[in-house]
Amino acid sequence: MAKKVLKVVKIQLPAGKANPAPPVGTVLGPTGVNIMMVCKEYNALTQGQAGMIIPAEITIYEDRSFSMKIKTAPVAELLKREAGISKGSGEPNKSKIGSITEEKLREIAEYKFPDMNAASVEAAMRTIEGTARSMGITVQK
């Protein structure tokens, strides 16, 4: 018989830097799961991606055990890294703050494709291009 799910928690933390302090402790504390074990597993799974914000989905079961699924980095983080900027434009329609090439856009789409709801890499590229546009990043064709 399968374990009964108590709660599913989604978190986004810097890779390899999870600790029991807030926000992790605040979210996981009421569930009764061993927070330090969750932090150790997250850090072990994300240690090769230092400097990125990595989302994770933690499924907590009634017996206080858990399973963790690591996702790919958010598109906005990938775009900021490729464009060499620290944050998106406050006025994306008026001021453009960076640019990326179409090849870089394809690389991001291929990396992100397993986590996206897109039928093809080209469809994923269009979605990511829209995100770039809303951040004030231009795509050079």
UniProtKB/Swiss-Prot annotation:
Listed InterPro entries: Ribosomal_uL11, Ribosomal_uL11_bac-typ, Ribosomal_uL11_C, Ribosomal_uL11_C_sf, Ribosomal_uL11_N, Ribosomal_uL11_N_sf
This protein's GO CC annotations: cytosolic large ribosomal subunit
Keywords: Methylation, Ribonucleoprotein, Ribosomal protein, RNA-binding, rRNA-binding
GO biological process: translation
Gene3D superfamilies: Ribosomal protein L11, C-terminal domain, Ribosomal protein L11/L12, N-terminal domain
A Pfam family: Ribosomal_L11
GO molecular function, one term: large ribosomal subunit rRNA binding
Post-translational modification: One or more lysine residues are methylated.
Described function: Forms part of the ribosomal stalk which helps the ribosome interact with GTP-bound translation factors.
Subunit structure: Part of the ribosomal stalk of the 50S ribosomal subunit. Interacts with L10 and the large rRNA to form the base of the stalk. L10 forms an elongated spine to which L12 dimers bind in a sequential fashion forming a multimeric L10(L12)X complex.
Family membership: Belongs to the universal ribosomal protein uL11 family.
Protein name, entry field: Large ribosomal subunit protein uL11B/uL11C
Native source organism of the sequence: Bacillus cereus (strain ATCC 14579 / DSM 31 / CCUG 7414 / JCM 2152 / NBRC 15305 / NCIMB 9373 / NCTC 2599 / NRRL B-3711)
Taxonomic lineage: Bacteria, Bacillati, Bacillota, Bacilli, Bacillales
